[in-house]
Amino acid sequence: MLGAIHLGVLAACFVLFVPMAMAGWHLSRNKMLFFSGALFISLAVCVHLTPYFPSVSDIVASVSSVVVYDHRISCINEVNQIVWDVKPVPNPESVRRNNGSTKLDYFVKNWDWMKSRKVLSCEFQKLDKFDVSDLLNGSWVVVAGDSQARFVALSLLNLVLGSDSKAMDSVRGDLFRRHSDYSIVVKEIGMKLDFVWAPYEKDLDDLVVSYKKMKKYPDVVIMGTGLWHMLHVNNASDFGFRLRQLSSHVESLVPLTPKEQEGGGSVSGRSVHLFWIGMPVLINGMLNTDEKKEKMSDTVWHEYDRSLGESKILRQMGGPLILLDIQSFTWNCGPQCTLDGMHYDSAVYDAAVHVMLNALLIESHQSL
Ligand SMILES: *[C@@H]1O[C@H](CO)[C@@H](O)[C@H](O)[C@H]1NC(C)=O
Ligand SMILES: *[C@@H]1O[C@H](CO)[C@@H](O)[C@H](O)[C@H]1NC(C)=O
Ligand SMILES: *[C@@H]1O[C@H](CO)[C@@H](O)[C@H](O)[C@H]1NC(C)=O
């Protein structure tokens, strides 16, 4: 049994050094004080309960790990909480003079995370090129799905390569070849990005199975479908059935064991970080064919949305994929942000990418 003095010294060390170690993870001073206080109280409780438990160190370890991780993990539920500020450009004349401008160019679109207390406490931030290079260094990223997924891939590459870089010019051309796959290696950071044209859920399913066969898994998979199925199959219960199949394949095929990182550390949980690109709001009157207007009605959209929820593929329903809530982004950006009622301004997909990266930071237990 430890003496009272030993215990006191141990407690003092914890209160002092644990928050200092955390400060190394870029916690603000207020947070540090908060953690010091929380630890102090936890330790005081521990000391009083010690006689009832076999070992002080077990309790201390469990208390500190709970304090550290609980806070950020719950932030996954808040990461999609963003608000939009869309207003007319101050100088429409200059837009008009610029050739090839569309309606989208007449609106300035800004977005940020909601300023509620809970969301603020999560300290989400838009990542710059260097943050992303750091985070995705050496990673294999796969974006798979329909045209929405393609726009997400474009936004991610914009961020990694820089939107005015020469490289981006050729990316834009190659990525938008109709209905085809695309692959690029960003040498500077050893990141590989694959875009896989996979307009149906079955295509996504096949992709997951193929990784299993190769025994080689990407680090990040961002996928999303729905619109093709809605237009060409138009059967929400079939959509739900396909999603359940995809979900169960993801659950059974993608390994859960900790995986060694390049840096030497290991990450617990699923070794692949998985995201689902939600369906955009469809503005029926703006859809560009009669077939679309008829098949992609609000009623059908809601049936598809319900099937997505019931498929339990999303984390919020207990499934494996974290939602990038395109529905909320497109609804809040509004009709000013789309030309065809289906594909939206790049600002929407940029937001989705920043949401994904913030979730990835939390999931991989990293901070900037
Ligand atoms: C717009 O197009 C016209 C003729 O096509 C050209 O003379 C002019 O330089 C272009 N302006 C800009 C800003 O690109
Ligand atoms: C990427 O990681 C490698 C190896 O860990 C390191 O040498 C390199 O500087 C990193 N590059 C960037 C851009 O962070
Ligand atoms: C819709 O899909 C379900 C499940 O695949 C199937 O049982 C049903 O017959 C389909 N409905 C129609 C109208 O095709």
Swiss-Prot record:
Keywords: Glycoprotein, Golgi apparatus, Membrane, Transmembrane, Transmembrane helix
Glycosylation sites: N99, N137, N235
PANTHER family linked: N-ACETYLNEURAMINATE 9-O-ACETYLTRANSFERASE, PROTEIN ALTERED XYLOGLUCAN 9
GO terms of molecular function: acetyltransferase activity; xylan O-acetyltransferase activity
GO cellular component labels: Golgi apparatus; Golgi lumen; Golgi membrane
Cytoplasmic side: 1-32
Protein role: Component of the plant cell wall polysaccharide acetylation pathway. Does not directly catalyze O-acetylation of xyloglucan but exhibits weak acetylesterase activity in vitro.
Lineage: Eukaryota, Viridiplantae, Streptophyta, Embryophyta, Tracheophyta
Lumenal side: 54-368
Species, as recorded: Arabidopsis thaliana
Protein name, entry field: Protein ALTERED XYLOGLUCAN 9
Bilayer topology annotation: Single-pass membrane protein
Bilayer-spanning residue ranges: 33-53
GO BP terms in the entry: xylan biosynthetic process
